[in-house]
Amino acid sequence: MKSLILAEKPSVARDIAEAMNIKGKRNGYIENEKYVVTWALGHLVTNAQPEHYDKAYKEWKLEDLPIIPKRMQTVVIGKTSKQFKTVKSLILDKKVKEVIIATDAGREGELVARLILDKVHNKKPIKRLWISSVTKKAIQEGFKKLKDGREFQHLYEAALARSEADWIVGINATRALTTKYDAQLSLGRVQTPTIQLVNARQQEINHFKAKKYYTLSTEIGGLTFQLSTNKQHMTMEDATQIANEIKHVEGNVDSVEKKVKKSHPKPLYNLTDLQQEAYQRYKMGPKETLNTIQNLYERHKVLTYPRTDSNYLTDDMVDTIKERLYALLATDYKSQVKSLLGQSYSSKMRIFKNHKVSDHHAIIPTEVRPDMQSLSNRESKIYMMVAERFLESLMAPHEYEAVRVNVTVGQHIFAFNEKVTRQLGYKALKMNNDNVVKKVAFQKGEKYHLQSLKVNEHETTPPDYFNEGSLLKAMENPQNYIQLKEKKHANTLRQTGGIGTVATRADIIEKLFNLNAIESRDGKIKVTSKGKQILDLAPQELTSPLLTAEWEEKLLLIEKGRYNSRHFIDEMKAFTQSIVNTIKNSEQKYKHDNLTTTECPTCGKFMIKVKTKNGQMLVCQDPTCKTKKNVQRKTNARCPNCKKKMTLFGRGKDAVYRCVCGHTETQEQMDKRFKNKSSGKVSKKEMKKYMNNEDSLENNPFKDALKNLKL
């Protein structure tokens, strides 16, 4: 009898097979005398679409809503059905005695496996592999500590409840809004509050009025002292009056305080922190950063599991510190690593906190030594960020002397503050000792004449627009960016982790860009006209982050077995009915801001101009009519003069390629040039690949609404 191991992806299945010495490669699985390893391809099973319950639902009609199945059904995803059949046959094989779930250790990974097992009506015992890295050692250790699958039943119930609730609310809200206003609109309990976050910041900036304020400074003993005052902002009159009062008054050194203080390194990275800093340093978008970390985790095996919200490690990881340090000998920090290898480590260190680790610990290096030459530029940057933060966390605190000198001048106090480094500690890693200062040699009781008095003018500044990094942080802590009526609501958001999860926030932002609900100009994220209208048209409950916080609060209770998942679904059904009724009864209007005078060749309605990943496209405004045609798009065809990518205008034989340098080619000229480049022979497939013919809509909500619908 054999154990069947179900991984989430082929790459992870191969890693498990290698670690467990399973070498018999077959079509869709790998086996030996003890184990059979197979894999999903992400989700193989998903929630059925509305037309599965009733063919009439294929046509979107407002009067059909809400669509709430009595019992949710699942279907096998068509494009991966072949692999599903393989997995099904293996699960039902009489030679298989048990199933070991080896999908990602988290809510979504549990759902991937359990939907498959439920679909094939599995009756065999289930065990769970729960690991945070896919290195050989981690896999082997994980198999020594397999958990009983029943321990994760509540996790599965929470995952299933989240999936079904998103389907019920998302399908109905999107169909209601789309059919009510005859426009391609999308609503969701995660998307819409994110638009609201961006809008709130935008409104704050728009309504901001700059105010001037003043400070007073003086030179004493060659150093600049600032007036200490209880007023947040002084007026020009206040500052000038004080300056006139004391300009001939002698200053007396009232106190010289010197305190030794310590600063500790920043916490280890969780995913959001890493995404935010990668954007600040390298302008890498959240999705790009996540994909890069995923590569370092799965392919190179040099980083631990990326989708984590924790900044800490568990006590049992103390003994793994040195093997991780050995791996970092391959980096430019070899000398610092050698020094750290000579130290001992304890679970009393600040980085070890069991109670602050839920599913996965912070992102840190694994024991696998990286081949830095084989890493891409992005991979190298991200790996070194994680390595640096890990090394800093193991080094001594930065120790400095905080010096404060108070000089009394009449009834006023002027202060000088400085930090003098005593021990670099963790800051030695980057040698950023920026604390070189003039020697402070004041003594209490000394008298000084003021060398100058200066009134300094300042101006208040508005908050910054969100960028892709700061928006992630705002989604994690929305209570810091929006006004809430009750304090308990802020606590709920804080405790549940805000809008979305570390695993979904990057996708949410990308989806909103694609929906044309938000846009980024010069790194500043703003709400589009369409996004503002969505907020105006949407029921208020869907624009507040409180909804997703309340959901998450209950989902966490379901995970812990303290709340019934069916009660949660019943609440979502009632909520959906309310949302649909609100939209049906609304008297508001939607106005297309991108409507053209071009008539749709299919139905005759005016078409709208939309952005795509590589250009622009005309799409029929009627959501039931799928007519579309290219206006322009970027291609992979290079200009023969300046080598930049050319833009395609039109289609077929009349197509024209233009470059920003002014060079223009017809389709015929392009075909001829391409044939010459390929020795007179080129296939349609090669041409299509070369042209990167991408015609998917960036702001088409139907693609998301009709597929996974993770709103």
Curated annotation (Swiss-Prot):
Its EC number is 5.6.2.1. GO terms for biological process: DNA recombination; DNA repair; DNA topological change. Residues 186-191 are annotated as: Interaction with DNA. CDD domains: TOP1Ac, TOPRIM_TopoIA_TopoIII. Residues 152-580 form the Topo IA-type catalytic domain. Mg(2+) binds at residues 8, 104. Pfam families: Topoisom_bac, Toprim. Gene3D superfamilies: 3.40.50.140, Topoisomerase I, domain 2 (1.10.460.10), Topoisomerase I, domain 3 (2.70.20.10), Topoisomerase I, domain 4 (1.10.290.10). Residues 672-699 are annotated as: Disordered. The record marks 60, 167, 175, 307 as: Interaction with DNA. Belongs to the type IA topoisomerase family. HAMAP family: Topoisom_3_prok (MF_00953). NCBIfam families: PRK07726.1, topB. Releases the supercoiling and torsional tension of DNA, which is introduced during the DNA replication and transcription, by transiently cleaving and rejoining one strand of the DNA duplex. Introduces a single-strand break via transesterification at a target site in duplex DNA. The scissile phosphodiester is attacked by the catalytic tyrosine of the enzyme, resulting in the formation of a DNA-(5'-phosphotyrosyl)-enzyme intermediate and the expulsion of a 3'-OH DNA strand. The free DNA strand then undergoes passage around the unbroken strand, thus removing DNA supercoils. This is DNA topoisomerase 3.
